[in-house]
């Protein structure tokens, strides 16, 4: 009787996933639970995307197609797509000779990056630019610059470039004054058909350098920057797929244009990302604490370069996902589900989870 009920449940889920507007993949995915986290076999992933072995990053397992090459290692959270670094929510695991990736990373990172075919309802018309810090809050400080000034300089240059492309721009601040994080989010949430880009510059060890871009950590996951493991819904998680698509478009262009060290697209629960109801990223343009990098960041030429990269990324994002879908064969829906038929004892929780 139990087997029959499981069969009916699997059949019902398959029918739901194969309704019009949903892409059903050939084959099945087996979901396994490892230390409380659901994983899928990477061999199933490669087969689903029709990936074959490729020459990729040294020391990594690399698979791909003509368009993408993916590289990763067992027991690490680094995940590379076309040599751009992402940080997974859970490490790649090796069990019984099989490499495995968490199902939440498949839904919330890998699939939206490899197949950004989802489409938002309206085209992007407005960009909310948030120059971090301001007023008495200087952010990171060195002998060469204050972070609040660098943030505002890049933001103003970005505004000009976006306006030249026909976008409306809203600045959370356009001078040296302080805003609370809640005020910044309130401004962004009041602007329809927009994205939110918070501009910052980093601080750390003297030798630390490079660019990193943050999006909100998926529900129920943690990260070095997530502060806590959260299972409740946050408003920002309603745009998980759009967040990672926007981060990919901006970050890849910034790394390519600047030649900076790629510190990756990472997950966090920064306050400005948690309660925002628009696609949102937090961009870190380099390290104020690194004297050589800070001197470079203080120049107009480098500020223009960063602003131009962010502008290009926003335009590319708009052209890719902010248009009516020709076919609803989306890699992800609003809930971020992987569109494939799956079997195994954990199929129901996998297919329903947001």
Regions found by a protein language model. Name each.
Residues 23-143, 153, 161, 165, ...:
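Primary recognition of N-terminal secretory signal peptides and signal-anchoring hydrophobic helices
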Residues 1-9:
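Bacterial N-terminal signal peptides that target proteins for export
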Residues 8-20:
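Bacterial N-terminal signal peptides
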């Amino acid at each position: 009787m139990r087997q029959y009920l499981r069969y009916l449940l699997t059949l019902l889920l398959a029918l739901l996933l194969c309704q019009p507007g949903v892409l059903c993949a050939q084959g099945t995915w087996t979901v396994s639970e490892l230390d409380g986290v659901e994983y899928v076999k990477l061999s199933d992933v490669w087969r689903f995307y029709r990936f074959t072995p490729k020459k990729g990053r040294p020391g990594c397992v690399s698979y791909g197609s003509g368009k993408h090459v993916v590289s990763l290692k067992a027991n690490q959270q680094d995940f590379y797509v076309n040599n751009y670094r992402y940080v997974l929510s859970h490490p790649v695991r090796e069990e019984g000779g099989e490499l495995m990736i968490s199902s939440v990373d498949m839904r919330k990172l890998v699939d939206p990056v490899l197949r950004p075919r989802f489409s938002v309802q309206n085209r992007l018309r407005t960009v909310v630019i948030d120059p971090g810090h301001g007023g008495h809050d200087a952010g990171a400080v060195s002998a060469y610059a204050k972070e609040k000034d660098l943030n505002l300089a890049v933001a103003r240059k970005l505004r000009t470039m976006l306006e030249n492309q026909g976008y409306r721009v809203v600045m959370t601040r356009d001078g040296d004054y302080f805003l609370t994080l809640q005020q910044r989010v309130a401004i962004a949430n009041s602007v329809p058909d927009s994205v939110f880009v918070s501009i910052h510059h980093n601080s750390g060890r003297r030798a630390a350098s490079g660019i990193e871009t943050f999006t909100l950590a998926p529900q129920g996951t943690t990260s070095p920057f997530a502060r806590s493991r959260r299972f409740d819904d946050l408003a920002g998680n309603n745009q998980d797929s759009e967040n990672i698509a926007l981060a990919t478009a901006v970050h890849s262009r910034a790394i390519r244009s600047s030649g900076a060290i790629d510190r990756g697209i990472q997950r966090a629960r920064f306050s400005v990302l948690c309660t925002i109801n628009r696609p949102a990223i937090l961009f870190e343009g380099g390290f104020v604490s690194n004297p050589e990098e800070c001197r470079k960041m203080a120049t107009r030429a480098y500020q223009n370069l960063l602003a131009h990269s962010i502008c290009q990324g926003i335009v590319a994002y708009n052209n890719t996902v902010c248009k009516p879908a020709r076919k609803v064969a989306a890699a992800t829906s609003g809930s971020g589900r992987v569109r494939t038929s799956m079997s195994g004892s954990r199929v129901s929780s996998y297919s329903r989870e947001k």
